[in-house]
Amino acid sequence: YMPAGWNQTSGSFREGPISEDTFWMLFNYVFSDSSAKRTTYKFGLIKSILDNLFNSEGEDYSLFISYENLFGKFAENYWNLVTKYQLKQMLPDGKSEYSKIEQIFKALIQEEPSFADIPFTSIPEAQRKAIIRQVSSDCRRNVIGALHRDFQACLYAFDLKGDGIFLNAYAFDFMLKYKVEIEKLNYYAWAKFLEKINDESVVVKLLDKLELATPQREDLSVFRQVLYNEFEQCNCFYCGKKLHEIHVDHFIPWSFIKEDKLWNFVLACPSCNIRKSN
């Protein structure tokens, strides 16, 4: 079963102003079980868009993000989840238990076993670019149309034959304003989905890898810990770049997931921190 919209090859965005309430309703829908998902790609794409907000180039009433930047981040974000933690990203469909991105990474590591232990950004540039092209070509046709449809054309316009997506200016403003909240909710929904498709043995292995003696409260927190370790701990929260110097430990009150102190701060690089405070 494929989610509705997955085979759409292009789509425009809704004309006119879009309220914050509408965006919250749409994001909550996408994070809920009502939005059909066979893979974690929708969460991965939302994460990539958030990571690229500062890389978008202004156009009339919209902001352009190239597929190269979008799926460069997408590939980088999935790399450790798949290669280091062996986390399955797809509900088995009878044909395969692995999503396309897992298949691409596994094929690469079969060719170059040494890549299994290095960060995505350390893969030699020519091979890394080839992987991003393959991920972009294979994954975009399954997720860009589906997420466009889920957001009722409010988030972006796209053409799969084009060079990227055009973020709606209202969507850009909303995602920038509520980046922290959206990011946390996205992790939470992603972790819930991972919990559904990965069995007990994976959780046990994760606990070893994360050096956690016992699961905290429930298995779900383990998956959230992985996502936090990978995406936030050493990265600028705003642009996603690796932090060479941690400029600020930015405390942000977090009202959605109250029990978790870990989720109450973000790290930013100097330039984003300065931009953010302007």
Features from the language model and the residues they span:
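Short, charged/polar micro-motifs that form catalytic or ligand-binding hotspots
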Residues: 31-39, 226-229, 255-259
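Betabetaalpha-Me/HNH-type nuclease active-site subdomain
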Residues: 4-8, 196-245
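Mixed-charge, low-complexity interaction segments
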Residues: 12-219
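Histidine-centered nuclease catalytic patch
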Residues: 1-4, 237-267, 276
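Structured loops at beta-to-helix junctions and adjacent beta-edge loops in soluble globular domains
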Residues: 2-6, 49, 270
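Short metal-coordination and nucleic-acid-contact micro-motifs, chiefly zinc-binding Cys/His arrays
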Residues: 42, 228-234, 261-265
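Active-site catalytic microenvironments for nucleophilic, acid-base chemistry
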Residues: 52-56, 242, 271
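Short metal-binding segments enriched for Cys and/or His
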Residues: 6-12, 265, 272-278
